[in-house]
Swiss-Prot record:
Keywords: ATP-binding, Ligase, Nucleotide-binding, Protein biosynthesis. Its EC number is 6.3.5.-. Heterotrimer of A, B and C subunits. It comes from the Bacteria. The keyword Nucleotide-binding applies. Belongs to the GatC family. The gene is gatC. It catalyses: L-glutamyl-tRNA(Gln) + L-glutamine + ATP + H2O = L-glutaminyl-tRNA(Gln) + L-glutamate + ADP + phosphate + H(+); L-aspartyl-tRNA(Asn) + L-glutamine + ATP + H2O = L-asparaginyl-tRNA(Asn) + L-glutamate + ADP + phosphate + 2 H(+). One of its GO terms (molecular function) is ATP binding. This is Aspartyl/glutamyl-tRNA(Asn/Gln) amidotransferase subunit C. It comes from Dehalococcoides mccartyi (strain ATCC BAA-2100 / JCM 16839 / KCTC 5957 / BAV1). SUPFAM superfamilies: Glu-tRNAGln amidotransferase C subunit.
Length: 95
C-alpha cells in the first residue's frame, strides 16, 4: 500500500505533528514500506496456530515478599520529635 502526501499529512495532523517538506517525502516512503511488510504478514497462513499475547514466559524478576516483625509502635512514637496521640506529627508540606 502506497501512502501519498495527503495520507501522511492526515496522519501528521492526527498526531499533531508539524512536518517539513522533506519529512513528508521521507515518511511517505518509510510508512509505505512498513505497510508493505504488514501486507506480507497478512498473507501468512496461521491456521492451527494458537493465538497468544505473550511469546515468552512471564517470570517476575522481583523476589517474594517476606513478612518480618516490625518495631513496636510505642518505640517508634517515643523517638518521634513531635507526636499527636498515636501519630507522628510533622510540619505541613503543602498549604
Amino acid at each position: 500500500m502506497k501512502l501519498n502526501r495527503e495520507d501522511v499529512l492526515h496522519i501528521a495532523r492526527l498526531a499533531r505533528l508539524g512536518l517539513e517538506e522533506d519529512e513528508i517525502n521521507r515518511l511517505s516512503k518509510e510508512l509505505s514500506a512498513l505497510l508493505e511488510h504488514f501486507e506480507v504478514l497478512q498473507q501468512v497462513d496461521t491456521t492451527g496456530v494458537e493465538p497468544t499475547s505473550q511469546s515468552t514466559p512471564v517470570k517476575s524478576v522481583l523476589k517474594e515478599d517476606t513478612i518480618k516483625p516490625s518495631y513496636a509502635r510505642e518505640d517508634i512514637l517515643s523517638n518521634a520529635p513531635r507526636r499527636e496521640g498515636d501519630y507522628i506529627r510533622i510540619r505541613a508540606v503543602m498549604e
